[in-house]
């Protein structure tokens, strides 16, 4: 069996980057893929990012990946910009996973020959010390992950990389094979994620709220300097994400009530199977 290989680099934290490799082998039983993961935890300054990318490229010399993925916030920031530069100069096809600020460098990434998946609802949290402790950070990310999972955003990411893996198994990946995606509320209008239209609009509402969380967090973290104002502002951003998660959960519950939840597991050979009825076998 032909095996596709990929290296995932995680610098800083996005909901999508936390899950991007695991979405592709959810039961750890695929025989057609092999991955390596390196990262810097939550750090994304240029020095840390450069060290992580260098580590990935060192691993690549022996591992010989078919492609490399870099995931983290704000692809336009200095650290991620360094990663883009290093990956563009490497011999490996590369994809950047980012959030809404990455739109500022979308054209630049295309000029660099990079693929990209920009997830606009993958929003920054309210990182003020007076508000954000480890527990609050974890709760926010749990809500964010529910939004991205239950609305189908993660499935879009899964499908994009599964297509790339199939290309790698068939032949060498070209620049034209790399995904170039911007995911937002309207992405759901182009897909058949939900059978119940009310489930779809609840999911769309969840994504719209989540996308706007980023603007509120930026205001509270970087614009407003009065503590009496910025603490409530960042806290309100987290309340928005909590409500978005509730809407996303309601959307999935509607699909459950109709026995229509879409599931797309991987077979051991990597084939993406599909089913909706709870007790039927995926095909």
UniProtKB/Swiss-Prot annotation:
Its EC number is 1.5.98.1. Optimum temperature is 75 degrees Celsius. The keyword Membrane does not apply. GO terms for biological process: methanogenesis, from carbon dioxide; one-carbon metabolic process. One of its GO terms (molecular function) is methylenetetrahydromethanopterin dehydrogenase activity. HAMAP family: MTD. Belongs to the MTD family. Catalyzes the reversible reduction of methenyl-H(4)MPT(+) to methylene-H(4)MPT. This is F420-dependent methylenetetrahydromethanopterin dehydrogenase. It comes from Methanopyrus kandleri (strain AV19 / DSM 6324 / JCM 9639 / NBRC 100938). The gene is mtd.
